[in-house]
């Protein structure tokens, strides 16, 4: 079997079974230990019988519901490869837009000041590690309630050469317990309503950690808790940045305005035109 034949088969098989037809390309890159460019340049190359077997097994497992990223053990985020397993949420492209928004506002709000930044809900470390690598003026802390997630993120920080301080704890508790003040707080908290979670694709519901996805009956539980804790840990001049679920923009904006009446609060839409981020600039 040639490369192009393997891709053609996978695309058709995945489509027939309601999966993303592009997943075959990701899997074949992994099996052949190459990148997309290498794949495209060698479309007529023969793959070995062993590679073909491995490739078809991966594709069949994905059709059964296992996410590709957990099978191959990594996902690309902001141009870097992050190790992932079933203890952490798979990083999404939408969260890259959150990173862009945070970095832009830091530059506008603080210039090149040295800042204390916290990412709440570590997961794979995609947010905290990316911020630390993209802006060397940031002292980045990150907190997760699950030690298993922290271990994954620590491995990513070591592999990618990022300096991040890890805390095992619940939301902002490590900071108000120590009196540490923060200039920037970023979070992609669990925001899916309980009822919506029940209707998710089995690929997500049966494999990604529920604790990283569900935010109570209306999806807003964690944002409400943040509003109780943020005033205790923020500097007078600060930035708060949240990723949100579709349709939650005005609710989260309202919560932030209630907690910080003089802040400039903005709902930002993602590349698909959906409300996806809320930023508060506090003076």
Curated annotation (Swiss-Prot):
Substrate binds at residues 188-191. It is an enzyme of class 2 (transferase). This is Release factor glutamine methyltransferase. S-adenosyl-L-methionine binds at residues 121-125, 144, 188. Keywords: Methyltransferase, S-adenosyl-L-methionine, Transferase. It comes from Bacillus anthracis. It holds the Pfam family MTS. One of its GO terms (biological process) is methylation. Belongs to the protein N5-glutamine methyltransferase family. PrmC subfamily. Its EC number is 2.1.1.297. Methylates the class 1 translation termination release factors RF1/PrfA and RF2/PrfB on the glutamine residue of the universally conserved GGQ motif. Coiled coil: none annotated. It catalyses: L-glutaminyl-[peptide chain release factor] + S-adenosyl-L-methionine = N(5)-methyl-L-glutaminyl-[peptide chain release factor] + S-adenosyl-L-homocysteine + H(+). One of its GO terms (molecular function) is protein-(glutamine-N5) methyltransferase activity.
